[in-house]
């Protein structure tokens, strides 16, 4: 199997992983904003995620010479390593539930802020756990200041969200139609605007430039998850739940591949990254399949009811959802490969993915467009702190013996 031997190789894996894991949320957000049901999107996403793990296992997991301590993927499959397999399965379930929750949080809280909050929880809980599980192979004097920088960036991100929310509220007050603004406040549908008055809808679309009040109204009319009039606590609760789930999957994977609790029978080698990732991804796919099949018929947060037949025939946006799944799958694989070499605490530097997600949020969705100078100043400060956090966490990486 292919093994990352050098610190430089591990850091390279982390950088590539950061780009992949920071980009797929933008694709899911794009599809939801275009009106595709999140249940349909996540089924495609989860399938591609599993395929990525299979490709990695049967390619990188089979390269090179197989040894007793580092067997290749197919050699290890029949071995008696179920305690570690169950830990990998637990990690896959946690990641999948966390990703599923973030998909809904993106609509309520926004792409950038959702990623900031979930990443902060992951850094505080997950990175600290990984540091001790890895027998402190990372440099604490560098690692924890990096965590501190990340937390500062989190508070800056919260300030960005508050400032931008105030900007948006002020823009919506400028709408010329009091009735239209009332519908936004109460979350009510206006059939005369959305369905019958095509001319008014076209005029609104013509004026809807990113960052304007018309832009937010048009977005609400198109998107799958309606958010106007909904309590912000719904989104924050979903985001908090997602963050806790995501903070625990990496320590579970760490335990699966390094057996710190000595659960394996004597003489059985530890799970290699590729075998653990294979079981990890199968578990994630199965829990995603079960939950989203339920959500097709019993949808959450006021979504339209669907069916398996409707999902099969809903090909619009499927290619993008599959692409997002591959990005997530390969991103996770690269994170684990880098973590095996440099320590999972350092590999958790990929949780600075809000840096990438914020970039896509600005470029693709016009987030913070036409905002106040205060919002821009806070945004630049947050991004600068994220850059510092990534650099410091990567510099803390040690080398597993």
From Swiss-Prot:
<keyword id="KW-0547">Nucleotide-binding</keyword>
<feature type="transmembrane region" description="Helical">
    <location>
        <begin position="375"/>
        <end position="395"/>
    </location>
</feature>
<feature type="binding site">
    <location>
        <begin position="224"/>
        <end position="231"/>
    </location>
    <ligand>
        <name>ATP</name>
    </ligand>
</feature>
<feature type="topological domain" description="Cytoplasmic">
    <location>
        <begin position="103"/>
        <end position="104"/>
    </location>
</feature>
<feature type="transmembrane region" description="Helical">
    <location>
        <begin position="11"/>
        <end position="31"/>
    </location>
</feature>
<feature type="topological domain" description="Extracellular">
    <location>
        <begin position="1"/>
        <end position="10"/>
    </location>
</feature>
<keyword id="KW-0067">ATP-binding</keyword>
<keyword id="KW-0472">Membrane</keyword>
<dbReference type="InterPro" id="IPR009834">
    <property type="entry name" value="Ureide_permease"/>
</dbReference>
<dbReference type="GO" id="GO:0022857">
    <property type="term" value="F:transmembrane transporter activity"/>
</dbReference>
<feature type="transmembrane region" description="Helical">
    <location>
        <begin position="41"/>
        <end position="61"/>
    </location>
</feature>
<feature type="transmembrane region" description="Helical">
    <location>
        <begin position="345"/>
        <end position="365"/>
    </location>
</feature>
<protein>
    <recommendedName>
        <fullName>Ureide permease 4</fullName>
    </recommendedName>
</protein>
<keyword id="KW-1133">Transmembrane helix</keyword>
<feature type="transmembrane region" description="Helical">
    <location>
        <begin position="276"/>
        <end position="296"/>
    </location>
</feature>
<feature type="topological domain" description="Cytoplasmic">
    <location>
        <begin position="366"/>
        <end position="374"/>
    </location>
</feature>
<feature type="transmembrane region" description="Helical">
    <location>
        <begin position="82"/>
        <end position="102"/>
    </location>
</feature>
<keyword id="KW-0813">Transport</keyword>
<dbReference type="GO" id="GO:0016020">
    <property type="term" value="C:membrane"/>
</dbReference>
<feature type="transmembrane region" description="Helical">
    <location>
        <begin position="232"/>
        <end position="252"/>
    </location>
</feature>
<feature type="transmembrane region" description="Helical">
    <location>
        <begin position="319"/>
        <end position="339"/>
    </location>
</feature>
<dbReference type="Pfam" id="PF07168">
    <property type="entry name" value="Ureide_permease"/>
</dbReference>
<keyword id="KW-0812">Transmembrane</keyword>
<feature type="topological domain" description="Cytoplasmic">
    <location>
        <begin position="32"/>
        <end position="40"/>
    </location>
</feature>
<feature type="topological domain" description="Cytoplasmic">
    <location>
        <begin position="163"/>
        <end position="231"/>
    </location>
</feature>
<dbReference type="GO" id="GO:0005524">
    <property type="term" value="F:ATP binding"/>
</dbReference>
<feature type="transmembrane region" description="Helical">
    <location>
        <begin position="142"/>
        <end position="162"/>
    </location>
</feature>
<feature type="topological domain" description="Extracellular">
    <location>
        <begin position="126"/>
        <end position="141"/>
    </location>
</feature>
<comment type="similarity">
    <text>Belongs to the plant ureide permease (TC 2.A.7.19) family.</text>
</comment>
<feature type="topological domain" description="Cytoplasmic">
    <location>
        <begin position="297"/>
        <end position="318"/>
    </location>
</feature>
<feature type="transmembrane region" description="Helical">
    <location>
        <begin position="105"/>
        <end position="125"/>
    </location>
</feature>
<feature type="topological domain" description="Extracellular">
    <location>
        <begin position="340"/>
        <end position="344"/>
    </location>
</feature>
<comment type="function">
    <text>Proton-coupled transporter that transports a wide spectrum of oxo derivatives of heterocyclic nitrogen compounds.</text>
</comment>
<feature type="topological domain" description="Extracellular">
    <location>
        <begin position="62"/>
        <end position="81"/>
    </location>
</feature>
<dbReference type="InterPro" id="IPR030189">
    <property type="entry name" value="UPS_plant"/>
</dbReference>
<feature type="topological domain" description="Extracellular">
    <location>
        <begin position="396"/>
        <end position="401"/>
    </location>
</feature>
<feature type="topological domain" description="Extracellular">
    <location>
        <begin position="253"/>
        <end position="275"/>
    </location>
</feature>
């Amino acid at each position: 199997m292919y093994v990352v031997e050098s610190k430089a190789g591990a850091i390279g894996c982390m950088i590539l992983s950061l780009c992949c894991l920071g980009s797929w949320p933008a694709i899911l957000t794009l599809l939801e904003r275009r009106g595709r049901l999140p249940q349909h999107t996540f089924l495609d996403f989860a399938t591609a995620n599993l395929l990525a793990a299979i490709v990695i296992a049967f390619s990188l997991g089979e390269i090179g010479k197989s040894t007793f301590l580092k067997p290749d993927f197919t050699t290890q499959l029949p071995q008696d390593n179920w305690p570690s397999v169950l830990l990998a399965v637990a990690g896959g379930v946690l990641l999948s539930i966390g990703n599923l929750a973030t998909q809904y949080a993106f609509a309520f809280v926004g792409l950038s802020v959702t990623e900031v909050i979930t990443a902060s929880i992951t850094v505080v809980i997950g990175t600290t756990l990984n540091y001790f599980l890895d027998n402190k192979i990372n440099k604490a004097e560098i690692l924890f200041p990096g965590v501190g920088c990340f937390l500062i960036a989190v508070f800056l991100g919260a300030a960005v969200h508050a400032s931008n929310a105030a900007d948006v509220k002020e823009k919506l007050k400028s709408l010329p139609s009091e009735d239209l603004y009332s519908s936004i406040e109460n979350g009510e549908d206006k059939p005369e605007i959305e369905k019958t008055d095509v001319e008014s809808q076209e005029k609104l679309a013509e004026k809807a430039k990113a960052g304007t009040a018309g832009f937010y109204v048009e977005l609400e009319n198109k998107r799958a998850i309606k958010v106007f009039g909904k309590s912000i606590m719904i989104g924050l609760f979903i985001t908090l739940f997602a963050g806790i789930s995501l903070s625990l999957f990496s320590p579970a994977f760490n335990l699966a591949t390094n057996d710190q609790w000595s659960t394996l029978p004597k003489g059985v080698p530890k799970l290699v990254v590729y075998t653990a990732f294979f079981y990890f991804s199968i578990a994630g796919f199965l829990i995603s399949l079960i939950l989203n099949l339920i959500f097709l018929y019993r949808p959450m947060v006021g979504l339209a009811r669907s069916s398996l037949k409707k999902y099969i025939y809903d090909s619009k946006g499927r290619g993008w959802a599959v692409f997002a799944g591959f990005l997530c799958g390969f991103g996770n694989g690269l994170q684990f490969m880098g973590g095996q070499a440099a320590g999972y605490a350092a590999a958790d530097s990929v949780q600075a993915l809000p840096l990438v997600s914020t970039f896509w949020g600005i470029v693709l969705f016009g987030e913070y467009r036409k905002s106040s100078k205060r919002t821009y100043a806070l945004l630049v400060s947050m991004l600068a702190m994220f850059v510092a956090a990534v650099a410091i966490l990567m510099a803390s990486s040690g080398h597993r013996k």
